[in-house]
Amino acid sequence: MSIMLSISRRRNSYILLNHSRFLRRFSYDVDPRPEIKLESQEFVVVKFVKTLQKTPQHDWASSESLSALVVSSSSASPLVFSQITRRLGSYSLAISFFEYLDAKSQSLKRREESLSLALQSVIEFAGSEPDPRDKLLRLYEIAKEKNIPLTVVATNLLIRWFGRMGMVNQSVLVYERLDSNMKNSQVRNVVVDVLLRNGLVDDAFKVLDEMLQKESVFPPNRITADIVLHEVWKGRLLTEEKIIALISRFSSHGVSPNSVWLTRFISSLCKNARANAAWDILSDLMKNKTPLEAPPFNALLSCLGRNMDISRMNDLVLKMDEVKIRPDVVTLGILINTLCKSRRVDEALEVFEKMRGKRTDDGNVIKADSIHFNTLIDGLCKVGRLKEAEELLVRMKLEERCAPNAVTYNCLIDGYCRAGKLETAKEVVSRMKEDEIKPNVVTVNTIVGGMCRHHGLNMAVVFFMDMEKEGVKGNVVTYMTLIHACCSVSNVEKAMYWYEKMLEAGCSPDAKIYYALISGLCQVRRDHDAIRVVEKLKEGGFSLDLLAYNMLIGLFCDKNNTEKVYEMLTDMEKEGKKPDSITYNTLISFFGKHKDFESVERMMEQMREDGLDPTVTTYGAVIDAYCSVGELDEALKLFKDMGLHSKVNPNTVIYNILINAFSKLGNFGQALSLKEEMKMKMVRPNVETYNALFKCLNEKTQGETLLKLMDEMVEQSCEPNQITMEILMERLSGSDELVKLRKFMQGYSVASPTEKASPFDVFSLG
């Protein structure tokens, strides 16, 4: 049973509530009508307070001068007695004066108003006492006993303070005993706040629902929305959907949440991938013409920008303009940042020019700052418009009087590095120093990265060492870049050197550093060093990823280290990493080379059980293994199975394996048949295909076939390689044949009859 319902059923137990006059006027909002001038009212207050202070408290009742002041003061506003009570300075004096005033109340012209306001001041004093509970209860009982109506302020104070002291029942009693006409929005706000803070959500929403009715006499206001929305969201009392519905109900009364709360809620929705819901909320608020500011729109614009939804961003900005919501400096930043990231730099520059200088809702002018300029300069650099970026930097310094910073120059440096203009990038570093801007680690990483990308590893090392001398230290990114660059050119010794330097510099390696080292060591087949790096990786609290496992398994397979292969597979299983098709293909190739076809079959079966279909690489590895041991029948059987039972079609590599195998056996007919099948199935032969066929041909007996194949290569635009030329030079040794070979090299047909060779034609081959 709710508190409000239980209290409602106990109302008859309060005898005082049977007085209809008390019910009707238990509380009201005083609208004092000043009857004398403000200066005269102040004079009355000062005179009364001084007289009270001079007169001993036990003589107040008998003091004729005080009695006279009561009579004369009653001609003034009832507020006089509230002010007198406040200026007494303590609860004890305030309650004594109230009791004195009550005893003399027959002399007051506006008794109820005067006593109500004086009691309000006493309640204010009581609430600030160290232990106010009993005092507040006593004052409330006095109001009931003496039939003194409470002011709205006094009512709110009692409801709030009782609630804070955990006396929610008492708060509700105060509210319930009010006349319905006195339960205005201000009082209801306090009640709702107290109920929500004490977890009585249902009771709070009963009061709120009355306020949210269409024809409500006391509708919600901005304070109502602030109280309710703050509490329900902070305490997770409602779902997002119900909060959205609640905002809509407030919106129908022309009330919007405060800008800070609404911005946070919109941001939360966007974070939860609910940008459409955020859009609907703002649209509904705009439709009902509720007062709104730019920040909530900025939150949604940021979300749309992250998703590169520029079309909807444009629509939202237009809606803002329609309802006269002025964008601010944050709006400008969001728009130009998104446009620059999407490479629409011209539009970003246009927005920048249009919005600068406009006034915001708070009266400030949108002034471009270094962040805006940096965004535009970076955008121009990213699309290669370096000259315009430099011009904007000049304008930034001279026209706008906006000082560039390290970010500004780092953007330019990155632009020049992307364009391969490394010397110009270094010149920008010198300009930084001239402007008394110290290069930072981002500067170093940008140039080192640019130099490494453009094959300037040595240059990158020199630059980095120079920067270190100037006091700019590298970080993990710097060392990662150098290590990766060294590994990419198979200079693993240097990569290990930079790894050690990184440790000396106090930089903790991350997993990517270890992966780069493992990759480099696997490429140069240094298995022992790779194992040591794996151990270091695990000591650092990291684990191998699937790519690293595959590289290591491949390395150990090449080294014929079966023990380590199985160790890696066991480790993978412990780490919860499932083998992928690359893992299985590597293992199948390994077992195939060792003629362990039982393991090959087992691996293929395991592969299917893991939900992985054999790939063209899988079939290629097995077919190659069968061919390498002369099991061509098994190889052909698997080859045909590809076309019949799997979705994988043979590619050029698989055809070449078979053609090469048959050519080695001298079975040119079978090899040529496979080549013709390639043509029929639209699988393009390559130079390896023709080289295998050429090896099988004898110039004396199969000269025409040789020339036809050479013509096919020309027609297919298949470039011969060094092996092709060596085979053909051996097969075509006569002068006429050498002329044909020269024409073949030049891309001409050779099968048709040719003119007699010039004596110098032979030398043109050299």
UniProtKB/Swiss-Prot annotation:
One Pfam annotation reads PPR_2
Q: Which Gene3D superfamilies match?
A: Tetratricopeptide repeat domain
Q: Which GO terms describe its cellular component?
A: mitochondrion
Please classify the protein's predominant subcellular localization into one broad category: mitochondrion
UniProt KW keywords: Mitochondrion, Repeat, Transit peptide
SUPFAM superfamilies named in the record: HCP-like
Q: Please report the residue spans annotated as repeat (PPR).
A: 151-181, 184-218, 221-257, 258-292, 293-327, 328-358, 369-404, 405-439, 440-474, 475-509, 510-544, 545-579, 580-614, 615-650, 651-685, 686-720
Q: Which domain of life is it from?
A: Eukaryota
Any idea where this protein resides?
Mitochondrion
Decide whether keyword Transit peptide is in the record. Answer: yes
Presequence extent in this chain: 1-30
Entry's family note: Belongs to the PPR family. P subfamily.
Protein name as catalogued = Pentatricopeptide repeat-containing protein At3g61520, mitochondrial
